[in-house]
Amino acid sequence: MINNFLICVLFFCYFLVQIKNLLFYLYLWQLKEYHLKRFLAHFSTYNGKKIIFNLTNLLKIFLLCFLLFSQKINLNFYLILSFYFILLGNFLISLFKKNIVKPKFTLKIIFLFLFFTSLVLAFSKFLFFKEINNYFFANLLLFDILLPFLISFFILFFQFFVSLYIKLLILKAKKKREEFKNLLVIGITGSYGKTSTKELLFTVLSSKFGEKVIKTREHINAEVGIAKTILENLNQNHKIFIAEIGAYERGKIKEVSEMIKPKIGILTGICQQHLATFGSLENIQKGKFELIESLEAQGIAILNWDNDFIKERFERIKDKLRVKKIIFCSTKEERADVFAKDFFVSKNSILFKVKTKDNQEVDFKLNLIGIDYAINALLVAACALELGMNLNEISLALSKIKDKDTGCYLEKYNENTQIIFATYSANPFGVMAHLNHLKLWQGKKIVIMPCLIELGKEAKEIHQKIGKEIAKNCDLGIIITKDYYQEVKSGAKTFGKEDKIIFSSRSEEILKTVLSEIEKDKDNIILLEGRMPEKIISLFKKNV
């Protein structure tokens, strides 16, 4: 018999299961920064496909089809009740284990959560006050299946109003920026190295100009964050503004450049990062060069001349650029305006000489991990020289920077093992550089990383190259997502080391595998590369 108590139980189970689904999709949209192309690109990944093709969704469709033929209302009710009771049980277990996927509760997320919760509640109450029949059951399942689409539809609908708010914010920031006639703005963009270059430059310029220097906060590089920095933090005491500029599509860097009006533009490097959202490598090149193309004739462009994609694009458009002064920085070509040579790389520092075209030459020391930071230092040095600093001042300021300031840092795990935490984000250039750095350790070398995302058609080839690099430099590679695991493995096969590449996504299992690998050796190194579940990171941080 179906009684009111059982109907209330079903209502309770159904409502909480929808709240769980709501939390997940809000998390996913927030993770992808409410960017439709990034959101859709996620569903081409292994984990993204699992969101669609899984046992729970299969059972929902099966139950929906079953209802078309079954006229036994009591049986149908208990099937639906059992189904949602089990789903609620899984939700409560995840809640108890603190494994529940949820967004970071910002004002925007709180608004969306309350809106969608009201929507779910209203729909549930509407249904549950109707007659209990097969239409009732079918509507329950249909709403459940369609909820992700409803969430996405309304988020995109609200994004229209958000975009109007952003345009207004940019206009206000642009107007305020115009009031600061003597403000020197330095724009920094690139596929990689933006944040570290910004932090290095801020440290160097602050050593000379003190509180007159302002920068965008850590990892804030979208138009909204930059506009808010201008509106909320910029004041008449500031003489230099350093803005990190990021983008997932063409036109965004141009939009920010029109707002901040940079005099100096620094291009850190170009690679295939976000190829899926830009559409092509050429679009990435065009998008990143929007900063350089925005510079007026009296401006200064500072380029990473080690980067082939920058060279290629520059050669195509150099005659069309308005900016006249272009500074080339290189660790490879001695003819560059700012050049680095005589490298000595240790586990946690880099020593090298910096030479300029006018034959200034000074020793530099960076207490950072990996030779790839040298080019960042050259870009910073080139900029600081233009602002009246000398190489000795720049070298002294850079020597005071700690690895944690750049997001890639080294920690002691135990007496025999160290860990490199490089878990903010990963790109092809950074992964290769970090893997190459591991050769400085004599013991076991282990990398734990997910497959890289948003690389479009280049993804397979890039992951094969990563596999080769792991095989050359590591004793074990643990890949925690399945998307291009086989490509990584096939890359390692080139060196006959495909058995050294394994897949594991369970944090406890990963830790157990790593500990068994390093227990008999000294001078071991573990590299945690790229964004990964906090549970994995926290397990390795316990001993740190």
Which residue stretches match the model-derived regions?
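Buried hydrophobic packing segments
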Residues: L201, L205, I226-I230, A377-L387, ...
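ATP-dependent carboxylate-amine ligase
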Residues: M1-S163, A382-N392, L396-T406, L410-V544
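Short catalytic-loop micro-motif centered on adjacent basic/acidic residues
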Residues: G187, I214-T216, I240-E244, A301-L303, ...
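Acidic, Mg2+-coordinating active-site environments of NTP-dependent enzymes
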Residues: L183, L267-Q418, G443-K444, Q464, ...
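A short, basic/flexible loop-to-alpha-helix module at the beginning of a structural domain
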Residues: L168-E179, Y409, L511-V514
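Active-site phosphate/ATP/adenylate-binding loop shared across adenylate-forming ligases
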Residues: L75-T106, T203-N237
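Walker A (P-loop) phosphate-binding motif
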Residues: L171-H219, M532
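Extended acidic/charged loop-beta regions that coordinate divalent cations
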Residues: C65-L75, L81, T117-F129, I226-K228, ...
